[in-house]
């Protein structure tokens, strides 16, 4: 989760909305939250989901979307208390932990825990974004080329996107992003409320928190404490604000209640978050092109290059 192509899908931690259903089979689909109700909510209910579509995603009432945040532009976090407490991965909080570490206070290697709000450490430059709403803006972006998107010029597209950003940002109140889907056939707008006062609350020692990098990333079972804890702050009116000692813990519209009941085989589990990138929306033609053209070309180039590199390595 180190880059951001915004779709709200894959979670950073194991967040589950769990209800027993031993007969349920995994469904590895990937959906935008605004389409839950019309595409797959009924299917998820049959698999054990007990939340309504409105409880998952709503622009008028608090919902699950209000508890899942984008941390910086690189990770996902989840709000777990009515005082803005946020969980994320240790590797997502790594740079923040490093920025506060010194020779005298080696928080990276020794860990850190605050005993009060006053002891929490401000992290300059770190922010979190709460999704306010998202919308299909394909018609606005492609305009007169809606039926022939291949004719839309990049200059036209960027101008139309810029107009949308200005219109919906409300003079800087919101962060607005417009992202292409299906290689530019569709465009979706994401409107965020951004909080710039984020503070470190807890970090385990690196010996516990380090998740293994590429060496261990795809190995199971793995026993690591890949987590860190932060808190989001707001002004006294609960609005986004730059860091100030007068700021107070943010009161979220919704937070995830923590359960210690454990899970059972067959419990319903849903993953929600901001993946770094995804190719889950590739068409069959794109998959065919990758398998039959792109990958073979890369492999052929590698087969030509690697022997040359090996020969040079052996002489050194």
Regions found by a protein language model. Give the residues of each.
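Terminal presequence/propeptide segments associated with secretion/organelle targeting
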Residues: 19-316
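Bacterial Sec-dependent N-terminal signal peptides
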Residues: 1-26
């Amino acid at each position: 989760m180190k880059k951001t192509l915004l779709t709200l899908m894959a979670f950073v931690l194991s967040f589950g909305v769990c209800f027993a259903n031993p007969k349920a089979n995994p469904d590895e689909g990937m959906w935008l939250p605004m389409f839950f109700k019309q595409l797959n909510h009924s299917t998820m209910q049959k698999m054990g989901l007990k939340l309504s579509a409105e409880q998952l995603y709503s622009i008028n009432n608090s919902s699950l979307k209000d508890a899942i945040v984008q941390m910086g532009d690189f990770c996902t976090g989840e709000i777990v208390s009515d005082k803005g407490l946020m969980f994320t991965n240790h590797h997502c909080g790594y740079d923040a932990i490093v920025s506060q570490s010194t020779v005298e206070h080696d928080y990276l290697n020794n860990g850190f825990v605050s005993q009060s709000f006053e002891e929490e450490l401000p992290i300059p430059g770190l922010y979190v974004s709460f999704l306010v709403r998202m919308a299909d803006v394909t018609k606005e972006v492609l305009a007169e080329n809606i039926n022939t998107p291949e004719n839309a010029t990049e200059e036209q597209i960027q101008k139309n996107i810029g107009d949308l950003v200005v219109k919906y940002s409300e003079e800087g109140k919101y962060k607005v992003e417009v992202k292409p889907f299906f290689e530019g056939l569709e465009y979706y707008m994401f409107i965020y409320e951004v909080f710039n006062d984020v503070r470190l609350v807890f970090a385990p020692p690196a010996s516990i928190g380090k998740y293994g990098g590429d060496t261990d990333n795809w190995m199971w079972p793995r026993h690591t404490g890949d987590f860190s804890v932060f808190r989001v702050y707001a002004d006294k009116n609960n609005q986004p604000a730059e860091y100030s000692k007068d700021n107070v813990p943010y009161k979220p519209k919704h937070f995830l209640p923590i359960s210690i009941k454990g899970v059972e085989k067959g419990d319903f589990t849903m993953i929600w978050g901001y993946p770094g990138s995804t190719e889950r929306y590739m068409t069959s033609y794109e998959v065919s092109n990758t398998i039959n053209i792109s990958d073979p070309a890369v492999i052929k180039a590698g087969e030509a290059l690697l022997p040359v590199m090996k020969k040079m390595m052996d002489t050194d």
